[in-house]
Amino acid sequence: MKKWIGFAALAFVTLAQASPELGKLHYLTEEYKPYNFSNESGAPTGLAVELLQQVWQKTNTPQQPITIMPWARGYYLLTQKPNVVLFSTARTEARDPLFKWACPIGYAEIVLMGLTKSPVNIAKLEDAEKYNIGAVRADVGEQLLLNNGFDEQKIMTANRLPQALKMLTSGRVDLISTNKTTMLDLIASQQLDPAQFKVFWMLSSEQFCFAFSHPVSDELVKEFQSGLTQVLASSEFQQIQAKYFPAR
């Protein structure tokens, strides 16, 4: 687990102008490129991280520590602690009432991906139940499978996506349930041939958001959402988006 302080706050921001309540929250994330990940020096970066830093500026909040940890740990803390913000969190129907939300960071296609040479054949979702499927523990990929009635005994979980990818390439699982964009980015970063991988089924299309512990006040979430909305409409966000999604 690594904790790093974000970029310095703007010099003109004073304590009187600051948003002390947003500064009392604990900001958690995972390795999930290109939305949030560690750079070469180990500091958090990515589209969602830079978006969050811009929100802090808009709300006159001093830059806060961001803690990177395995997703399952962050998700557990989100459910147990009163002052956690976890990102980038897919806002599914099952999760929606559990937390409070500021959206969107972006949108994701959650898919079942396997090896192109695999004999996997899926004509309907139920066909996938006979295969061994890998997923990141407590990630939306795992939760969507469970919500659709898949046998948890046939879902092999990993702490991080690179571990799940290794399970796929070594033949331990037939498919991975994950975010298509993040998976393709990981494949490229490991210098694997993307032609060797194939999407066999799309499970869902979901918003990525900042999820707040339920005890966080509605007013505070509203303040954060207002800052987020301003950033999303700004030229700064267009530059951030072009940096991490250059093809868009």
Give the location of each predicted region.
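N-terminal signal peptide c-region/cleavage motif recognized by signal peptidases
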Residues: 13-18
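Extracytoplasmic small-molecule ligand-binding "clamshell" domains
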Residues: 19-97
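Periplasmic-binding protein-like
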Residues: 29-31, 108-111, 189-225, 247-248
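Extended ligand-binding regions for polar small-molecule ligands
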Residues: 46-59, 139, 210-240
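Ligand-binding clefts/hinges and TM-proximal coupling segments of bilobed small-molecule sensing domains
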Residues: 62-65, 140-156, 195-196, 228-248
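Short helices/loops that flank or line small-molecule/ion binding pockets
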Residues: 67-68, 72-84, 100, 127, ...
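A ligand-binding cleft/hinge motif common to bilobed small-molecule-binding domains
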Residues: 76, 88-98, 174-195, 200-204
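Flexible hinge/capping segments at coil-to-helix
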Residues: 114-133
